[in-house]
């Protein structure tokens, strides 16, 4: 589901951060300050236009409310997360942020306003610091370290052979899955979504 593969941090990025679907129209509404209300109403979705993956899904999240999607493999948790981030367009229904249809919001503004950590972590070959900074490329070292502390990753990072300068290889294969997840949380934190 979503975009797979590890891509070096250039103009191309992993599906989590800047995936673009060739058939999606860009929104026109500038979204500068997210209040945080999310409404999905009667959402239907299929990846291929034929086999429906989600049918008549509705949810409402109040500003500041934390929601966890739990369920069996294949139940649609990742799909819902991908739709909330508009990695795909829905077939039917509505998704609105603060009363604004998600299709009208500029994708860059939407993605900047959301912090998402998916179950499958995407890290790239580079330093720990570079992998955290990937959440916001202009973040300072101090901001990245603060994000790592917020994610409870700073202590394990400092125990690595080169600390924040430790090179990660092959999607972070030299880290445990839990450590990689903490880096992903730090990456989302440094992006500083409202």
Where are the predicted features?
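ABC-type nucleotide-binding domain
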Residues: 2-194
